[in-house]
């Protein structure tokens, strides 16, 4: 059985890595989601999530959104440039998105960073 997962090396894990992205980021915005990115020298893309309770109150909703973000990143990470990405939520309306709509919005964001 071939397991597909997001390896630990593909995630931003500490504060300094997040700060690095926020210092001089490229930004791409959709309705409610902002993607910050910055080139890295590792040769592969990495992802970090910053989803606050201010915009997504309930944990089960934050978890659903994070699950979809990680899954869309995992499926297209091999086509992305070597960058560090941080996704933030900037609208309370995102909790009303159906899963399909959320995935379409995320795929639009990743499309901007293809090779």
UniProtKB/Swiss-Prot annotation:
SUPFAM superfamilies: Ribosomal protein S5 domain 2-like. Pfam families: Ribonuclease_P. One of its GO terms (biological process) is tRNA 5'-leader removal. One of its GO terms (cellular component) is ribonuclease P complex. It comes from the Bacteria. Transmembrane segments: none annotated. Its EC number is 3.1.26.5. The keyword Cell cycle does not apply. GO terms for molecular function: 3'-tRNA processing endoribonuclease activity; ribonuclease P activity; tRNA binding. Keywords: Endonuclease, Hydrolase, Nuclease, RNA-binding, tRNA processing. Gene3D superfamilies: 3.30.230.10. It catalyses: Endonucleolytic cleavage of RNA, removing 5'-extranucleotides from tRNA precursor. RNaseP catalyzes the removal of the 5'-leader sequence from pre-tRNA to produce the mature 5'-terminus. It can also cleave other RNA substrates such as 4.5S RNA. The protein component plays an auxiliary but essential role in vivo by binding to the 5'-leader sequence and broadening the substrate specificity of the ribozyme. HAMAP family: RNase_P. Consists of a catalytic RNA component (M1 or rnpB) and a protein subunit. PANTHER family: RIBONUCLEASE P PROTEIN COMPONENT (PTHR33992:SF1). Belongs to the RnpA family. This is Ribonuclease P protein component. It comes from Blochmanniella pennsylvanica (strain BPEN).
């Amino acid at each position: 059985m071939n397991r597909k997962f997001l390896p630990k090396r593909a995630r931003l894990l500490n504060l300094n890595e997040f700060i690095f992205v926020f210092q001089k980021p490229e930004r791409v915005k959709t309705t409610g989601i902002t993607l910050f990115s910055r080139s890295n020298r590792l040769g592969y893309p990495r992802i970090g999530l910053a989803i606050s309770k201010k915009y997504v109150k309930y944990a089960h909703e934050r978890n659903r959104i994070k699950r979809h973000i990680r899954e869309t990143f995992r499926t297209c990470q091999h086509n992305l440039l070597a960058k560090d990405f941080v996704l933030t939520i900037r609208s309370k309306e995102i909790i009303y998105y159906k899963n399909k709509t959320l995935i379409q919005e995320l795929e639009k964001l990743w499309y901007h960073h293809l090779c």
